[in-house]
Amino acid sequence: QTAYNWSYVHTHAIGRSSYKERYAAIYRTDRVQILSSYVWSDSGDRFEREPQIVKLRHKQTGEDYTFINWHTIFGSTSQRRAEIAEIRNVYQSIQNSDSSDQDVILLGDHNRDANSNYWDSLKSLGVSNRVNDLTSINSSCGYASRYDHFWFQSNHTNEYSSSGRDYISNLCTFRNGISDH
């Protein structure tokens, strides 16, 4: 429990196989207004789990941001490569849909290091990863991989500050409390 009021938006269970996931965005109601939240329409069935798109407004500044919340398939190399190539199209489509709102942020568990050449097509848009730390927590309760990312174009998202990161004192307790794997 905190001194602040929180709320969330979430998706239905998403996934092609019997394994399904839900995406969610949790936010402080005194700071953020949700403008929209939906699951990306994937008519070509290019994603194992379609991204969640959340558009929000920071109440104090009036700035709008659009988040693409997405968990890349872990499957084969070719499956991952195909999904990562397609997320570029999603990013560009969202950015092109509203010329007044270019603050698009792609985030999530992307099952691939940001330095991989898989990301070259996204990087060609001027998008860069802003978190390149070990973030995934392994079974021995240590940091394991650089799969969790925040991608955006710094020329459009100039409010970004890299000065903060939450550190958790007991990774085992945290991991076991929020993850099923």
Which ranges hold each PLM region?
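Divalent cation-coordinating acidic motifs and surrounding scaffolds
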Residues: 1-180
